[in-house]
Structure formats: structure tokens, C-alpha cells
Amino acid sequence: MADYQLIVIGAGPGGYEAALRAAKLGKKVAVVERREAGGTCLNRGCIPTKTLLHASAIYRDAKNGAHCGIHTEDIHADMAEIFAYKRAVSQKLSAGIESLFKTAKIDLLRGTALITGSGCVRVADADGSANDYTCDDILIATGSVPSRPPIPGLELAMTSDELLEGCDHLYRSIVIIGGGVIGIEFATFYADLGCAVTVIEGMDRLLPSMDKELGQNLALILKKQGVKVFTNAMVQRVEQAGEDLAVHFTCKEKEETVSGEAVLCAIGRRAYCDGLFADGVGVKMNGRSIAVDGNFETSLPHVYAIGDVSSKIQLAHVATAQGIACVERLCGVQDHTDLSVVPSCIYCRPEIAVVGLTEAEAKEKGIPVKVGKHVMFGNAKTVIADPGRCFMKLVAHAETRELIGAQLMCEHASDMIGGVAQALANHLTAEQFCRAMRPHPSFEEAMTAALEDLCEKLG
């Protein structure tokens, strides 16, 4: 008889949620984790960055409160205390996961996992000792790690993992290589605190994978905050320049150099499955990611993979949804989440949240569309908060009238995009989504204005 019915490798959002769901459905479960419960998300990603952004927003709002009668003197940011706060939040949430495991009678096996065969996992402790476990099924949820391309001198730059370890002082200046989600959130954090920030992006705009207007609007807002932005810029090398680091790059066929006390490499992440399989044991790969079928099964029978290690979309909530769907199918339960509808958020100011297709993506697929848009200059909550130019765009199929996409750039966009995702998952038409009464004053009432514009264009 096997030791467990399911062994999950990795206690990040995909792994721990899958384990809890499997235990609830009656499986005997173990989770292997070599670091803190919660994985990258809780300890080196989503939660630490949002904690830092929460702290920097308090500083920014207090420092800039004179226009509404709030006057502060001698306000300063203590970086050691900010990072201590970040660690406390992560530790509290990580401890919460371990408590959930105990309640669900899930064994947490501390150590590094090695898959020695289908249904066989060896767990090595830090002291070098190892134990072998057998199981009916294995679920790989080992996530991803920061990428560092082979650019001369880039080893001098920090990754997001290293930056989040903390620093006891505020950098005078920081150069961020990469204008995607990770780079933009760190740019927001450091700009809020008064650090001189430069962002270097290789594509023609910030957030190149998103709607063009989002990146363009964000660049304007960041520049107003004093952030220097270079696009169409290719980094050639990084080198020490006295106490600073110099980043040399080409931009519009010109050689440029910017220097900073620190440099952050934020140009993506790669699937992490290094050393996961014993010699002679392996699975089919899709580039550097583990290849899976429609049920998340790898080429090795009874071995499954979910989340960043196998998915094109590297988001915590995608890993969670995939993990739950995988174990539900293993248990013969109908999974309930539409995995094709994926919201994505960026926690800059104003926030950005998207779901579904952009107008350009729909047209590339040959889908006839109409787009409704509302610029929130007259939205009362936006006028009060004054985060910069905000807007909402909604994309609908021109013939079926169903909503197929949304792009929000406004305060609390991340808290509203779930409702739009619900509309997409249930194939609601623009008229059906417009029926709901939305509160006033609120940021969300701009959704009604965008929907009314969309319905008018649909005719």
C-alpha cells in the first residue's frame, strides 16, 4: 500500500490549494516544500511586493496631502522597518497555510523532492539524509524563478528575489531593466519613496503584452512622477562605475548610459524544475516548461504539473485554479472554473487590470468587435483620489454582443476585474452586464458609463 494517495511538490498557491482540495475530497496527502509554505507568491512575489506598495502609498499620500489639508513634517521612510513589516506579513500568511495543513491532516515534508519514478518521491533533508515515499499520483507545483539573460555584467544586477531580501537604506537611484509587471511595480514603489528611477524596456512600449493604450498612459503618468522611461532600448552591458552601476544600452540607434546605486533585472521568469527528476527519469518538455495534456498529466504516467512550471501564464491564481481542477478530475469531481478566462493585475497607480481579449487581439483572430470606453475625468471618486488619467475599455463581439475583453486603468481596478471575468465566463452580453445598478459614488460606476457607450456602438 502506498504511503500517500497524492504527493504535491511545492507549497505555493497552486500546490497548497490543490493539497487542501484533495484532502477535502478524501485523499491522503503530503506536500514537499524545501522553503517557506506559500512559495514565491507569499514570500518572494505577490504578497511582499503588495506589502511594500501599501507602505509606499501611505508615505506618498501623507507627503502629498497638502492639497486636501493634510500637512506633515519630518516624514521619512525607514527601509529596515518597511522590510521588517513585509517579512511579518509573509510569515503570518505562511504560518496560516501550515495551520490549514494540520487541520486538514496533510503531512508537510520538509526538504528537496526528487522524483525517482512514477509514484516514487525521495525527500532529502538539509543535513543530507533522505526518505523515500510512495504514492498513487504526484503533482508538480514547483513554480518559477527569475530569468537572467546572458548580458555581460548582468550578474551585478539584482533579481526580484534578491531585492526583496531587503536593504537598510533607500537607494539614491535604481535602474530597472524590464517594463513589464514586475518592473513597473518596483518602479512605483521606489518612485513613491522619492528614489530616482529609470525603466529600460526592449519593446516599443511599457507592458508590451497588454493593450497599447495602457502602456502609453502608464508611461505618461510615470514620467509625471519623475520616472525616466526608455523604450525600444536594448541593454548591452552592465558595469561598475565607482559606487554606482552603469547600464549601457542602445535606444533609437543611439548609445545611451544610465547609472544607479542599484540595478534590478526584471525581464521575466522561467519554469523551475531543476534537479527534480532522477537520472533515467524524466518528462517531455515544452522548451524549459514541463509539457502537459488537457488534464495536466505529463508524459510520465500519474505525474501531473500545474502553475508556472508548466503554464504559459505565470500567475498565482492561474496556478491555484489549475491545481484545484487537476485534483478534482483525479477525484472524479466536475471542476467548475473556466480556465480560459484569466484576469491579470498590475498594482501601480492607478492600478491596471485586464481580462480576455484586447481590440487588437480580437481583430487578429478575425473577430468583429465593438469597443466601449469611458475616461474617468468626471468620476467623483477619481477626482477625489487624483491618481492621474483613468479609463475603462470593454470589448464585445459585434454580432453576438457578448463581452470578450476588458481593460481597466483606475483606482481599485484589481478589485473590479473579477466581476468582469464573471461576465466573460458566463457569456453575458453588454446589455446583460449593464443591468446591474452600481453604487454612487464609486470607481465602479464608470463601468456603467463604458457599457452604455458599448451598447450604443453595438446599435
Segments the model singles out, each with a brief description of its role:
Residues 1-12, 170-180:
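Beta1/beta-strand and adjacent pyrophosphate-binding region of the FAD-binding site
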Residues 7-14, 20-35, 40, 47, ...:
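Flexible, glycine-rich terminal cap/loop adjacent to redox cofactors
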Residues 7-9, 113, 132-143, 176-177, ...:
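Short hydrophobic core segments
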Residues 2-4, 20-27, 32-171, 198, ...:
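Glycine-rich flavin
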Residues 15, 183-184:
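N-terminal Rossmann-fold NAD(P) dinucleotide-binding loop
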